Design a protein with these regions (language model features):
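Short, surface-exposed, polar/charged, turn-prone segments marking secondary-structure boundaries
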Residues: 15, 53-57, 89-93, 137-141, ...
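Short beta-strands and strand-loop turn motifs
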Residues: 25-28, 61-67, 113
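Low-complexity, intrinsically disordered basic tails/loops
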Residues: 24-36
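Glycine-rich phosphate/diphosphate-binding loop of Rossmann-like nucleotide-binding domains
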Residues: 33-99, 108
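Glycine-rich phosphate/nucleotide-binding loop
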Residues: 2-10, 16-22, 26, 106-110, ...
């Protein structure tokens, strides 16, 4: 049975995004461009519940997307959200997360305002497409590379599907 999470007033666009070993939730990926700190706290609560109940993560790690890992980094929104998430006993808040660490299992759910989240989402999409184009170019360079491509073709197709933004 689906029901509302107590204390959550605003929903977020929260896609599951690929990371090195599995997936993470990005909340908000673009629905709420301007957020209040309470909204980011609520996104953390939603991410925690979803990752636990649906994805089976026992103690989901919630991170706040920011320009640095130190608590004093970011603007007023990030400072206030950091304080709220730190005090919230319903989430396992692990602190600030830098964008470069997100794909490497830094957190199970990453919270941010929708403006920042949409930039992260679109960057993810672009990097995935650029990498696939690079792989194609390398595999077309020589006969040896073309033969190597044939050996890993099924794995490359699976990776392409996993990185396809239409999948998330």
């Amino acid at each position: 049975l689906v029901k509302r999470i107590k204390g959550v007033k605003r929903v977020a666009f929260a896609p599951l995004m690929p990371k090195s070993e599995s997936f993470f939730m990005l909340a908000d990926g673009g629905a709420n461009n301007e957020c209040r700190p309470e909204m980011l706290e609520q996104f953390g609560m939603m991410g925690s519940v979803y990752m636990q109940k649906v994805m089976g993560v026992q103690k989901p790690r919630i991170g706040l997307a920011n320009v640095g890992t130190e608590p004093h980094k970011g603007g007023e929104l990030q400072h206030a959200a950091f304080a709220l998430l730190s005090e919230n006993k319903d989430v396992h808040f692990i602190g600030n997360i830098e964008a470069r660490d997100i794909p490497f299992d830094a957190a199970d759910a990453v919270v941010c305002d929708g403006f920042t989240g949409n930039i992260l989402l679109k960057m993810y999409e672009g990097v995935a497409m650029a990498l696939m184009n690079k792989f194609k170019a390398v595999f077309k360079k020589s006969l040896k590379n073309k033969l190597a491509a044939e050996m890993v073709l099924n794995d490359m197709k699976a990776m392409k599907k996993e990185l396809d933004y239409n999948e998330y």
